[in-house]
A protein has these predicted regions:
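Helix-loop boundary and gating motifs at the non-cytosolic
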Residues: 1-23
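A late C-terminal transmembrane helix in Major Facilitator Superfamily
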Residues: 107-133
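Helix-to-loop junctions at the C-terminal end of transmembrane segments
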Residues: 34-47, 132
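Structural signature of the two symmetry-related core transmembrane helices
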Residues: 50-65
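Intracellular juxtamembrane helix-capping segments at the cytosolic ends
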Residues: 88-101
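Helix-loop junctions at membrane interfaces in 12-TM secondary transporters
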Residues: 67-78
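Loop-to-transmembrane helix entry/capping segments in MFS-fold secondary transporters
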Residues: 17-18, 101-113
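A membrane-interface helix-boundary motif in multi-pass transporters
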Residues: 130-149
Length: 168
């Protein structure tokens, strides 16, 4: 839902294209900040498990609120959460791969990760069209639900580096 359908929803709410561009620029800037500045520190402090859980919580908050408002002020406060929902989750996933996948299979692991996330994104984008047609902007609440479901999956599915010996 978040890319194309956010633009469609915000445009339908009367938000100017230039403002929508600023909102997305804000999200991308937050992503860069997380990738290069705060993400590594969060990953070091909380481990892959905690980082993935934080991403799930941030997504639940972001999409719960985005599903019920098109206030530019509110959206501008929410958009930086993209840094946590995308960049921090990606960093946590890469850390998990580094922990679990042998070095000689790192390329294969990354290819499987990219293929899986790409296929899932494609399927959810197709589903998003149907949901948006039926529910409009409230369809973003499904994204919040997916993030809420991801929280226990992140907590129990992501092992920290210190837990690696328990997995082998």
């Amino acid at each position: 839902m978040y890319d194309a359908f956010a633009v469609i929803s915000w445009s339908a709410a009367g938000i100017e294209p230039s403002v929508i561009s600023i909102l997305w620029s804000e999200a991308v800037a937050a992503e860069v900040v997380v990738f290069f500045l705060i993400g590594p520190a969060l990953l070091h402090r909380f481990g892959a498990r905690g980082a993935a859980a934080l991403a799930a919580v941030a997504g639940t908050v972001r999409w719960s609120v985005a599903g019920v408002t098109t206030s530019v002020l509110t959206l501008s406060i929410l958009q930086p959460l993209h840094g946590l929902t995308f960049a921090l989750l990606h960093l946590a996933s890469m850390r998990m791969m580094q922990t679990l996948v042998p070095v000689g299979l790192a390329g294969t692991g990354q290819a499987i990760y990219a293929f899986g996330s790409g296929c899932l994104t494609a399927m959810l984008t197709l589903l998003s069209g149907v949901l948006y047609a039926k529910f409009g902007g409230a369809a973003f609440l499904l994204m919040a639900l997916l993030c809420a479901v991801a929280l226990p999956l992140a907590w129990f599915g992501f092992a920290d580096e210190r837990d690696r010996s328990a997995l082998l």
